[in-house]
């Protein structure tokens, strides 16, 4: 009968324990990596800077890594259209304001994202513009305690010679959650939802 060296078994168990702890730590670290602050991507909450590219760049980075939370901290962040992506939670901290910029060229139309459906071809492109846009997205959340302010941006080419962008426009999407945030000063609809749940 072959004898087992007990000291080697103890070393193996100790190594296994260290490896297990290391993997657990890596797992916890990766959870921390799923939070992205728009300020880290160049956004400024000064109420002056156009943050459209910075916010969209942050959402894109979050989405490319499998999703997570995009933090909008305290401040007033002027922006044009924000393109929502699957598995991304847009979280507005207390006293955070996402405010529509007074430049209609900065707003995208849902028609830009969804060119298949005849419904969007009937409506004028101006009618389909929004501050927050999502087409074919899943598991999107807009949460927190902040404000999304449409800033009542008027469009002379819009319906009735005044209607500007919606605050939120979602199409062909599912698993959408909106909680805690306030939607203010829409120049058209606060939320326009088509084939989305």
Put a short name on every predicted segment:
Residues 1-2, 197:
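Short intrinsically disordered, low-complexity coil segments enriched in acidic
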Residues 2-16:
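Bacterial N-terminal signal peptides that target proteins for export
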Residues 19-22, 27-197:
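Extracellular/periplasmic carbohydrate-active domains that bind, remodel
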């Amino acid at each position: 009968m072959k004898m087992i060296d007990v000291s080697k078994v103890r070393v193996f168990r100790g190594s296994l324990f260290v490896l297990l702890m290391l993997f657990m730590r890596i797992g916890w670290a990766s959870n921390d990596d799923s939070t992205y602050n728009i300020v880290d991507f160049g956004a400024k909450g000064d109420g002056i800077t156009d943050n459209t590219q910075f916010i969209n760049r942050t959402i894109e980075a979050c989405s490319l890594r499998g999703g997570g939370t995009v933090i909008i901290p305290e401040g007033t962040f002027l922006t044009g259209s924000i393109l929502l992506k699957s598995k991304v939670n847009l979280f507005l901290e207390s006293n955070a304001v996402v405010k529509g910029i007074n430049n209609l060229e900065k707003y995208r139309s849902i028609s830009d994202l969804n060119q298949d459906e005849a419904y969007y071809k009937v409506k004028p492109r101006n009618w389909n513009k929004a501050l927050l846009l999502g087409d074919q997205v899943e598991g999107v959340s807009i949460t927190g305690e902040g404000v999304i302010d449409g800033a009542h941006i008027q469009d002379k080419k819009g319906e009735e010679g005044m209607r500007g962008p919606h605050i939120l426009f979602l199409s062909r999407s599912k698993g959408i959650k909106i909680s805690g945030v306030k939607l203010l000063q829409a120049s058209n609809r606060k939320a326009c939802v088509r084939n989305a749940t």
